[in-house]
């Protein structure tokens, strides 16, 4: 699963965010060299804020392409029909969705941002890949990142409050992550 995340982060052409940097730097150099030499980029479906995911299409051989999709958990789950669980591919049914939600909610309550990774093997073809190809994916797993607030955040918020300025939070993060961060910096998450 981490290799799939690395391929996605390595081969995307957009700006790499802190999560991509963490994935790239968290992979040992030997594995990174091996992945880069074995897999070639074929195409890319760029990130956009509507889909909240992005995909790269890579090939290890001339017969098959692999679409590697990475993004916000719910948006990835929406395009998955199966999940890799204990080394086997099983249907992504309600029971499995509840298990995933239980685990990821626990991670979010700890302030960890969760990014999901899914894949799909396709016969090799010519031409561009489209958003429609991001369907019937296999959820490979998810990676969790801690992105703590800067040490200066809480004092800055106190100073704003003392000056009579009300601070509102607008975030694309999970509600649970936002609540944890608000608690850490002394804001009411309500």
Residue spans for each PLM region:
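The conserved cystathionine-beta-synthase
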Residues: 149-159
């Amino acid at each position: 699963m981490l290799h799939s995340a690395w391929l996605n982060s390595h081969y995307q052409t957009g700006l790499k965010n802190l999560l991509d940097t963490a994935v790239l730097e968290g992979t040992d150099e030997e594995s990174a060299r091996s992945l880069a030499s074995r897999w070639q980029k074929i195409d890319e479906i760029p990130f956009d804020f509507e889909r909240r995911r992005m995909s790269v299409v890579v090939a290890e051989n001339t017969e098959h392409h692999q679409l590697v999709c990475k993004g916000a958990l719910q948006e990835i789950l929406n395009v998955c029909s199966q999940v890799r669980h204990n080394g086997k591919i099983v249907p992504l049914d309600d029971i499995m969705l509840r298990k995933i939600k239980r685990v990821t909610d626990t991670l979010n309550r700890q302030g960890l941002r969760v990014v999901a990774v899914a894949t799909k093997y396709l016969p090799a073809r010519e031409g561009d890949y489209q958003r429609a190809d991001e369907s019937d994916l296999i959820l490979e797993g998810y990676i969790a990142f801690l992105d703590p607030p800067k040490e200066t955040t809480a004092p800055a918020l106190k100073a704003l409050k003392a000056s009579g300025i009300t601070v509102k939070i607008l975030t694309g993060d999970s509600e649970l992550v936002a609540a944890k961060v608000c608690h850490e910096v002394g804001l009411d998450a309500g």
